[in-house]
Amino acid sequence: MDLWVAIQALILGVVEGITEFLPVSSTGHQIIVADLIGFGGERALAFNIIIQLGAILAVIWEYRRKIIDVVVGLPEERQAQKFTVNLLIAFMPAVVLGVAFADLIHEYLFNPITVAAALVIGGIVMLWAERRDHAIRAETVDDMTWTLALKVGFAQCLALVPGTSRSGSTIIGGLLFGLSRKAATEFSFFLAMPTMVGAAVYSGYKYRDLFQPGDFAVFAIGFVTSFIFAMLAVRALLKFIGNHSYAAFAWYRIGFGLLILATWQLGMIDWSTAIG
């Protein structure tokens, strides 16, 4: 492994870690940055699986106490049982629709116009969700009912559309359905755990032939970097929403969507190859 490859792995690990749990589309950022630094090919596909796994393990580690409490209390504690049921209910819609329509979505929606439109529309909806008057129905994730969990689960299905952002769809959905900012954000984190681990395992098996022993060092750099920066991003986001709305992220989504359209129209990035 030469120095430049190590730097590429470091850069992409940072990008994944920072953007995965922010409502801004980590995939879009990965595509642009990977193109700018010349990181592509089959190695890149396997590498992306590894760094996504690093990011999700970071949030699992960050919430390890909550997870342990739920697991230990599951046999007898009603709150632990309720939380687990809510998580499973929210998890299932994306699994069913993802398995049923994944190939069609990849064939017809993986293009720059879809990605840009999803970013812009998501940003506009996020602004509306933040500015409208609505009653808070759940201050914390423990206050959520199964119906609220199901609604957020259906909102997560929107993330099947490229550019929507998994965290963006669940956070926006949570806000629209009456969750507080903290509850919407934390439930998005918890819902990411089974969703992303499942996706990583599925993709890892599907593309298992792409994992080569010679790439171990590159993968290790990306994994560790993604883990560290995802943990920092999660902590920073929770602190940020304590005193701020999601409006800044909404405007960022809109600007990023327009940037994607510009890079595509001007031929600066070959998006057809990147996401086709």
From Swiss-Prot:
Tell me one Pfam family matched here: BacA
Per UniProt, subcellular location reads as: Cell inner membrane
Q: Which GO terms describe its molecular function?
A: undecaprenyl-diphosphatase activity
* HAMAP family in UniProt: Undec_diphosphatase
Report which reactions are catalysed by this protein: di-trans,octa-cis-undecaprenyl diphosphate + H2O = di-trans,octa-cis-undecaprenyl phosphate + phosphate + H(+)
Q: What is its EC number?
A: 3.6.1.27
Query: What the protein does?
Result: Catalyzes the dephosphorylation of undecaprenyl diphosphate (UPP). Confers resistance to bacitracin.
Q: Report the transmembrane regions from the record.
A: 44-63, 85-105, 109-129, 183-203, 214-234, 249-269
Q: Give the originating organism.
A: Stutzerimonas stutzeri (strain A1501) (Pseudomonas stutzeri)
What keywords are assigned to this protein? Antibiotic resistance, Cell inner membrane, Cell membrane, Cell shape, Cell wall biogenesis/degradation, Hydrolase, Membrane, Peptidoglycan synthesis, Transmembrane, Transmembrane helix
Its BP terms in the Gene Ontology are: cell wall organization; peptidoglycan biosynthetic process; regulation of cell shape; response to antibiotic
User: Its GO CC terms?
Assistant: plasma membrane
The record gives the membrane topology as:
Multi-pass membrane protein
Other noteworthy facts: Bacitracin is thought to be involved in the inhibition of peptidoglycan synthesis by sequestering undecaprenyl diphosphate, thereby reducing the pool of lipid carrier available.
InterPro entries noted in UniProt: UppP
The similarity annotation says: Belongs to the UppP family.
Question: Which NCBIfam families did the record assign?
Answer: PRK00281.1-2 (NF001389), PRK00281.1-4 (NF001390), undec_PP_bacA (TIGR00753)
**Gene encoding this polypeptide?**
uppP1
Supply the PANTHER family for this chain.
UNDECAPRENYL-DIPHOSPHATASE (PTHR30622:SF3)
Supply the name of the protein.
Answer: Undecaprenyl-diphosphatase 1
